[in-house]
């Protein structure tokens, strides 16, 4: 049992190797570390909260079943995000291209606790969410994976089973649309900060 206390200090590659050897607690640590990031990616891709939770769970189950395929060439988080992205695309296609954004719940209200900077950032995030919803599905997926999910263009292309050049085009068009939509009326900061903010 002494090894359990060292799991949080271990690198993802070490945890994956332990998980491949049957250590469920090691895989549990990977889920604890990366679960929120995977759910967040799925939400940015357009999944409702409950769907994002279900798809994240499915992604980690698939990752557990395929853990011997993880070689550590990239990060574990990028690997499991690619799995999650593929599951989301499959889910989206099965839904016969139903507009998943139509039923998206309204964002939670901005809490004003006296910190104007925090309130401003919350408002920017809401604006960004609305701007992302205005993109075509393929643009939103590519922008969400590359900027919100931290995947490279090549990793996003693999996750979406789409040619690399197409992903790059979708990202460029999506960012151009976001810049136009989010540009302050009289100039100011650009969308790049807001996308990463």
Report each predicted region and the residues it spans.
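Arg/Lys-rich amphipathic alpha helix in sigma70-family domain 2
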Residues: 68-72, 82-103, 121, 179
